[in-house]
Amino acid sequence: MNANELMIGDWVRRKTNGEYHRVCEIFQRPEHGWCYKEKFGLINELSDVEPIKIGHDILIKNGFEVEDGAGYVREDAYGRSVIVSTWDCNIKVVHNYDIEFNKAFHWTFHVHELQHVLNACNVQINI
């Protein structure tokens, strides 16, 4: 992964052992290139991480519900809904603004990309 793909708080998976880590800091070291620090202070190289594919378990754990014909849906008190299409493995974020209905679409395949979209709606996810 590249440093410009990540934000603080993103979830990634280490290639060497499959562990999930949450990025707490991103920095560059001359001898190792781009690195990240996870919550326990351990430092790992970005070359040793990969994105986490979005799957059923992660979506259910984060409050999404299976809805026939739409895939997975999550709505909050502000009228925001997130629809995950089951037929093409893409995520579409639909946002309701006050009285007007506007659609803002963002297609994604990985957990960190979903985090970026949901952060804009002030929604955090867990792994």
Feature map (PLM): residue ranges:
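Intrinsically disordered, low-complexity, charged/polar segments
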Residues: 40-65, 107-121
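Amphipathic, interaction-prone secondary-structure segments
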Residues: 65-90
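Intrinsically disordered, low-complexity regulatory segments enriched in Ser/Thr/Pro
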Residues: 82-109
